Amino acid sequence: MSTSTSPAAMLLRRLRRLSWGSTAVQLFILTVVTFGLLAPLACHRLLHSYFYLRHWHLNQMSQEFLQQSLKEGEAALHYFEELPSANGSVPIVWQATPRPWLVITIITVDRQPGFHYVLQVVSQFHRLLQQCGPQCEGHQLFLCNVERSVSHFDAKLLSKYVPVANRYEGTEDDYGDDPSTNSFEKEKQDYVYCLESSLQTYNPDYVLMVEDDAVPEEQIFPVLEHLLRARFSEPHLRDALYLKLYHPERLQHYINPEPMRILEWVGVGMLLGPLLTWIYMRFASRPGFSWPVMLFFSLYSMGLVELVGRHYFLELRRLSPSLYSVVPASQCCTPAMLFPAPAARRTLTYLSQVYCHKGFGKDMALYSLLRAKGERAYVVEPNLVKHIGLFSSLRYNFHPSLL
């Protein structure tokens, strides 16, 4: 008399046969311990990780960030109050060459009082230019004030030290009475004015357009020197419309519609998979090589770097300027944009042909022009500026947060 065996019973018998020393059990335990215990414990405070516990930490971290920004704003204010004035005739660093190689144009409006965003930005640029020394003698700081009100205290203070272009100085502008001109279009027009002023005033080789809440990273000048003098001599980079120096960290994950990210992600698996397989085989005393084990570790490493956060692994590239990557740009955002002079002139023409509105800001306008005009643009990774402005100049935000 034969008896039938249920699938559940067969599965149970197979599981019983598995010993703690079997490869399948060991890899299963590794997966559970890594993704269920170790990674969540290690990464629950990492802002750009999938393991980040938003409800536990976001409010506190946002408040701490704002308090720190206030302190740094006060420090930047004292920094300039203690510097000798240059009466606005030359930059406080030194007199740049008659035709600068790079003009650093900081676009500023009057923002939330107390944070002194633009002072933080300019003071950091000043420190870095001093550290850079003779290598940066062809760099020129330039402030572009697009605030309609005359009460922009920080811009007035900086005019003692840095050359300033004031868009609305001595003009009767009826922008506020024109219902067809919205804040997004005005921001684009301000951008065009500042870019054009930079070209007309200095006729440089490059213009770096920096918004007044984008603080430069320590490595910005060595990296730009390497990129512009070495990497951008390559044919596919030479005629780029612009190079972005910032992309939001929250948008830097691998799971993204950009093909280059997917290729990079697969590359991570192809690199770490064999390495982790070799380590496992060595310490587990397994003979030979196993393709299934390598496939497991490839997927394991790909999942780990994505869930922990690609942003944090990109930071390893800061070890050397040559490790920074240049990849095709996406549409968001414009805190820091580098334009070669010929491309800057093309950009002025392009932007004069588009009208910005809510949902179609200047960043989207610039990105849309790439396909329409057959242009190319790139972004450098990791970021070369830090975005510190939680208070937008376009949108009212009474409860700012880091996400």
UniProtKB/Swiss-Prot annotation:
Changing K362A: Reduces GPI-GalNAc transferase activity. No effect on Golgi apparatus membrane location. It is found in: Golgi apparatus membrane. Changing P335A: Reduces GPI-GalNAc transferase activity. No effect on Golgi apparatus membrane location. Disulfide bonds join C132-C136, C144-C194, C332-C333. One of its GO terms (cellular component) is Golgi membrane. The keyword Oxidoreductase does not apply. UDP-N-acetyl-alpha-D-galactosamine binds at V109, T334, P335, K362. Glycans are attached at N87. Changing M270A: No effect on GPI-GalNAc transferase activity. No effect on Golgi apparatus membrane location. Residues 44-259, 309-403 are lumenal. One of its GO terms (molecular function) is glycosyltransferase activity. Glycosylated. It is a multi-pass membrane protein. It comes from the Eukaryota. Keywords: Disulfide bond, Glycoprotein, Golgi apparatus, Membrane, Transferase, Transmembrane, Transmembrane helix. A motif (DXD motif) lies at residues 211-213. Belongs to the PGAP4 family. Contains three transmembrane domains, including a tandem transmembrane domain insertion into its glycosyltransferase-A fold. Transmembrane domain 1 functions as a signal for Golgi targeting. Golgi-resident glycosylphosphatidylinositol (GPI)-N-acetylgalactosamine transferase that catalyzes the N-acetyl-beta-D-galactosamine transfer from an UDP-N-acetyl-alpha-D-galactosamine to the 4-OH-position of the first mannose of the glycosylphosphatidylinositol (GPI) of a GPI-anchored protein (GPI-AP). This modification occurs after the fatty acid remodeling step of the GPI-anchor maturation. This is GPI-N-acetylgalactosamine transferase PGAP4. It comes from Homo sapiens.
